[in-house]
UniProtKB/Swiss-Prot annotation:
The protein's name in its UniProt record: ATP synthase subunit c
Membrane topology qualifier: Multi-pass membrane protein
Pfam families: ATP-synt_C (PF00137)
Site (Reversibly protonated during proton transport): 61
Any single Gene Ontology cellular-component annotation: plasma membrane-derived thylakoid membrane
Location of the protein in the cell: Cellular thylakoid membrane
Keywords: ATP synthesis, CF(0), Hydrogen ion transport, Ion transport, Lipid-binding, Membrane, Thylakoid, Transmembrane, Transmembrane helix, Transport
GO MF annotation: an example: lipid binding
């Protein structure tokens, strides 16, 4: 493999996983904080808020997993390598 392609692939993989985890991490923190605040205001709605929160966190985490898959493809099954 060309050293330039190899180094660009490693850099792209690092950016893919880094940027893919940045947004969902911030979003998960905000969502969790708002859920705790909502449960504190209305304790009787705790079950509904918690269920919605867990579903939302799963959707957010899937974005990070997509970034991880792209990074693994770039590192181990690079389509740009000859």
């Amino acid at each position: 493999m060309d050293p330039l392609v190899a180094s660009a692939s490693v850099l792209a993989a690092a950016l893919a996983i880094g940027l893919a985890s940045l947004g969902p991490g911030i979003g998960q923190g905000n969502a969790s904080g708002q859920a705790v605040e909502g449960i504190a205001r209305q304790p009787e709605a705790e079950g509904k808020i918690r269920g919605t929160l867990l579903l939302t966190l799963a959707f957010m985490e899937s974005l990070t997993i997509y970034g991880l898959v792209i990074a693994l493809v770039l590192l181990f099954a690079n389509p740009f390598a000859s």
